[in-house]
Swiss-Prot record:
Database matches in Pfam families: Ub-RnfH
Gene name of the record: rnfH
Family matches, as PANTHER family: UPF0125 PROTEIN RATB (PTHR37483:SF1)
Gene3D superfamilies linked: RnfH-like (3.10.20.280)
Organism whose genome encodes this protein: Pseudoalteromonas translucida (strain TAC 125)
Annotated InterPro entries: Mopterin_synth/thiamin_S_b (IPR016155), RnfH (IPR005346), RnfH_sf (IPR037021)
Disulfide pattern: none
Region feature Disordered, mapped onto this chain: 82-107
Protein name in UniProt: Protein RnfH
SUPFAM superfamilies: MoaD/ThiS (SSF54285)
């Protein structure tokens, strides 16, 4: 038997469960055994994106002693759109050059 941790974070709270599983258990099996999907109905069990220690893994990867399984939520905003909006805001606030988008020249 090995001990692993299953974590799921929301903007305001995080759930962390330590469970004991049989050696050879996969990431997906451990998530199901932990019961975290029942505690958080917002987790889409059909489209899980999982990771171990900040690295995305396939659901069939076998676990090792002390692994931390992370359940990732989908991105809310497109990263390119978010970057574009931040750049436009910086131009409006004078923190960026209106033509080049770079830092304004200090004189």
């Amino acid at each position: 038997m090995i001990d692993v941790e299953v974590v799921f974070a929301l903007p305001e709270t995080a759930t962390s469960l330590t469970i004991e599983v049989v050696k050879g258990t996969t990431v997906e099996q451990a998530v199901i055994q932990s019961g975290i999907i029942e505690k958080h109905p917002e987790i889409d069990a059909t489209a899980l994106t999982l990771g171990v220690w900040n690295r995305t893994v396939k659901p069939n990867q076998e676990l090792k002693e002390g692994d931390r399984i992370e359940i990732y939520r989908p991105l809310i905003a497109d990263p390119k759109d978010a970057r574009r909006k931040r750049a436009e805001k910086a131009k409006e606030e004078g923190r960026a050059n209106k033509v080049t988008g770079g830092r304004p020249i200090e004189r």
